Each structure stands twice: as C-alpha cells, then as structure tokens.
C-alpha cells in the first residue's frame, strides 16, 4: 500500500503521464523501498549462526546456481569460510556447473552422483561444514514449481534433515 500511495501522489502532481513514465516511477519507488529497508552493512549478513545455512530454491532457469557462485565469492571476500552443497542432483550439468564455480571462487563443494537423494547431499554438506568450522553453507536445489507436490515435499525433507544437525537450519531460504 505504501508504494501505491507514493505512486498516486506522484501521478497527481503530473496529471498526465505516459506508460513509460509510470514504469519509471514504479521502478524508482520500488528501488526506494528496497534501499530504505536494507542497510548495506546487513546485506547478506549471516549473524551469529555458524554455519549459516542458505537453501537456494526457485523455479527452473532463474539463475540459482550462478547466484550461489556469486554469493560464495561475496562471503569469501569478507574472509568467511564457505562451502557449497550440490543438492540439485536432477539437472544434467548442475553439479559440473557448481564445480566450476567452487573452483573459480576457491571454496569446497560437497557432491554425490546424479540421481542421489538431495536431502542426503544437504545433510552431508552440513555435517562436513560443522566438522570443518565453515561459516556459510550454500545449498543448491533443483528447480521446481509450486504445483509439483513431490518436489515441494522434497524441500520439506531437506529442511527436516538439516534440522537434525542444526535445529535452526536453514537460516535463509
């Protein structure tokens, strides 16, 4: 509602605006809300939860794996120890792509063979991270749509398995 009020106020001032101008106003207002609510020092902050577990989920093809590589690089640049878990055991080349990222960034990758249980990979990743005193764990998962019940249930299983090692995991989804 806050964004709608701001847009209405700006539109009232200008009276007649084009759809391009409205688009620009909308982008500016969204940016303002995001920037006002995010302190740069807190962005991607892990707090005191170590290892801080981030479970990366989303639909197919949105860049989850690439984002994990970039987040791993960010956290490593802050001097944190990072580990990646390759729990997307479904997509061909997902594990290979993470291997490239982990080598490029210089972080450890926990993986199993294609078709392995993603919850098992997640558990092994967190167990290894605890044993090696890792600060941040990034777990890649297969793309999924909300209407695919079996894949949504798989996320629940991953969460339950992670919580056997850390009751607060995952800390971010």
Can you say where each PLM-predicted feature lies in the sequence?
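Conserved ATPase-coupling elements of RecA-like P-loop NTPase cores
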Residues: 94-96, 146-152
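Primarily NTPase-proximal linker/entry elements flanking Walker-type ATP/GTP-binding cores
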Residues: 1-89, 94-114, 122-130, 134-141
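Inter-motif core of Ras-like GTPase G domains
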Residues: 81-83, 107, 135-136, 152-173
């Amino acid at each position: 509602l806050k964004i709608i009020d701001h847009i209405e106020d700006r539109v009232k001032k200008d009276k007649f605006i084009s759809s391009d101008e409205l688009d620009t106003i909308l982008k500016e207002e969204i940016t303002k809300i995001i920037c006002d609510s995010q302190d740069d020092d807190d962005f991607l902050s892990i707090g005191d939860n170590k290892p801080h577990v981030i479970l990366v989920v989303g639909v197919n093809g949105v860049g989850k794996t690439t984002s994990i590589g970039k987040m791993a690089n960010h956290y490593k640049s802050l001097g944190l120890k990072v580990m990646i878990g390759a729990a997307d055991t479904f997509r061909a080349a997902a594990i290979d792509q993470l291997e490239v990222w982990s080598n490029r960034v210089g972080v450890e990758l926990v993986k199993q063979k294609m078709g392995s249980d993603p919850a098992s990979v997640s558990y092994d990743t967190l167990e290894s991270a605890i044993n090696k005193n890792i600060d941040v764990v990034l777990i890649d998962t297969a793309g999924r749509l909300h209407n695919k019940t079996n894949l949504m249930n798989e996320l629940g299983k991953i969460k339950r398995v992670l919580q056997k090692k850390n009751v607060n995991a995952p800390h971010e989804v």
